[in-house]
Structure formats: C-alpha cells, structure tokens
Amino acid sequence: MSDKPVHVVIVAAGSGSRFGSDIPKQFVPLCGRPVVFYPIEAFRTAMPDAEITLVISPSMEELWRDLCAKHGFTSPRIVYGGATRWESVRNALGAYPGHDTVYIHDGARPLVTPDLIKRLGAALSDGRADGALPTVALTDSIRLLHDGKPSTAVDRSRYKAIQTPQVFDGHKLEQAYRLPYSPAFTDDASVMEAAGHDNIILVEGDSRNIKITHGGDIALAAYHIDNAAK
C-alpha cells in the first residue's frame, strides 16, 4: 500500500457539441457559477485531503484561469485531455500515478453529493472489490434493437443506468489503462473489466446526479440546487 492520498480525476475536456453553446457545457454558468465548480467543491467537502486533477482541453485553459480569477476559486492541478474521454483519463493517471484509490468523475455532473462520494468510498474500503459504481433504476421502457429485425421489449428491472463518480483500486486502474483503446470502453468500469478486474460493486446512486448534456439540463440542475438550499 502507498501513503498517497485519494486521487480524484474530474474529466472536463469534452467539447459538449450537443449542448449548443459557444463554450463547453462544463464551463457554462449554473446559478451564477461554472458547472464544474460544483463537483470540485463536493469532493473537497467529502475528502479534504484528496488530490484533485482537473482534465481540460488546452484551448480552454485561459478561459478556466479567467473563471477562477473572476470567482475567487482555487483551481486544482491541471492535466490536458486527449481526443477521447479514455485518453483524458489515461493522461491524468499517467501524470499522477501510484494512488491506492482513484475516483473518476464527469465534470458535467454538478450535483454529485459528498454523501454519494463517501458511500462509494466505503464500498471499496475493505479492499476486496476492484471498484464501485453509482447506479439508478431505469424508469422508461427500453427495447433491444436487432439488425434488420423488429426491436423487442426487455425487462428493465434487469438493467441499471450508471453514473459517476466511479471509484477503483488505483493500481489496477492504472494497469487497465495500459490496454489499447477499444470502442467497447463506454466508461472506466468497462476498461477495468477488459483487464480482468471485474469485481465491481453497484451502489445506489442519486437520480438528481444528472449529466448536463442539453440546454434544458441547466434549468433542471438549477431547480435541484434551489430546492437543496431551502
């Protein structure tokens, strides 16, 4: 075991093309402050000693520094992202290796709570699991698509939607990210599973922990923030 604190990687290097803004969604205002400020603060509250790495596009660094100066916000250390989320996470792990525990979180999920962060860490604390993921139940009906054939209904109770943060044994995660990229890597857990580290615990997530994807999501996130403040 190392004596390094927990490593938190917040991935905020995406372009957010579906959001329809001049700047990536993780930097747009949410209740007057950039979206990505919120998860950084949640991790600082939950784990004051954690080392936080923010992964951003090089083209956004000037904007980020300006936003921090404007709001009096202390920036975590910065790593430049790659062309894909997988590359961005790999860059962060490569820049700051050797941690026993690593959290990976989407910078566009502003409503993560310290409680969820702590519950995920507790699920991993006994050292037996490779990782832990927050999940929420599906509420819509879902159908399975077949090439050239009609779609079929499936039992949604057998499926879960996966959120972030995802937390892992840091040494196993670093090993997994040495694998060559595969289109099957839909999240960090899928990278771990490809490396044979498949003892992944599912933890009850939070339906409010939405990912900002479209313009209307900002209004929904603001609603949740306003309600939490009452």
Question: What role is predicted for each listed range?
Answer:
Residues 2-62:
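N-terminal glycine-rich phosphate-binding loop and ensuing alpha1 helix
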Residues 45-48, 69-75, 127-128:
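Short helix-capping segments at alpha-helix termini
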Residues 49-53, 75-76, 130-131, 178, ...:
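Short active-site oxyanion
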Residues 75-77, 83-149, 163-164:
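Conserved beta-loop-beta/alpha segment of the NTase-like Rossmann-fold superfamily
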Residues 152-162:
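A recurrent flexible, glycine/aromatic-enriched loop bordering the glycosyltransferase active site
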Residues 2, 160-230:
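Conserved alpha/beta core of the MobA/IspD/sugar-nucleotide pyrophosphorylase nucleotidyltransferase superfamily
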Residues 10, 36, 92, 105-106, ...:
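Residue-level signal for inorganic ion chemistry
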Residues 19, 64-68, 120, 142, ...:
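Hydrophobic packing residues within well-ordered alpha-helices of enzyme cores
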